[in-house]
Amino acid sequence: MLKGIHPAISPELLKVLAEMGHGDELVLSDAHFPAHSIHSKVIRADGIGVATLLEGISALFEFDQYVEAPLAMMQAVPGDTLDPSVEERYLAAIKKVNGSTPKVERVERFAFYDRAKTAYAVVITGELAKYGNIIIKKGVTPVK
């Protein structure tokens, strides 16, 4: 355990966050996401919700400021519905740490899968919410 690191951030996830460069993307997936069939770098975060991970990551991770939307979530399939509280929980977790929230874009289901294939890694969580996946894009960490 390290001081200042959220307990939900595993050593493996901390290593991946440090390895990522600006513009790299990380998928935080729900428990139903086909992570192992679409990506070779999968980190398990069983029993931990996406909002909890977003809170921990937001303290360590600068979101990309040079794109319109550094967050991407899956659109509902036609005829299906989204629970707006899922996005609200995720943004509240980020806002708790950063004081503001980046913009979220909605991506068609299969386009989301294609984008996830090119991500730096996929973190499969214990999140049970339908359409509970989010892609986050890393930005440039400011020098202080």
From Swiss-Prot:
Q: In which pathway does it act?
A: Carbohydrate metabolism; L-fucose metabolism
Q: Where are the transmembrane segments?
A: none
Look up the record and report any one GO term of the cellular component aspect: cytoplasm
Reaction catalysed? Answer: alpha-L-fucose = beta-L-fucose
The listed locations are:
Cytoplasm
Superkingdom field? Bacteria
Q: What does this protein do?
A: Involved in the anomeric conversion of L-fucose.
Q: What is this protein called?
A: L-fucose mutarotase
Q: Which organism is it from?
A: Actinobacillus pleuropneumoniae serotype 5b (strain L20)
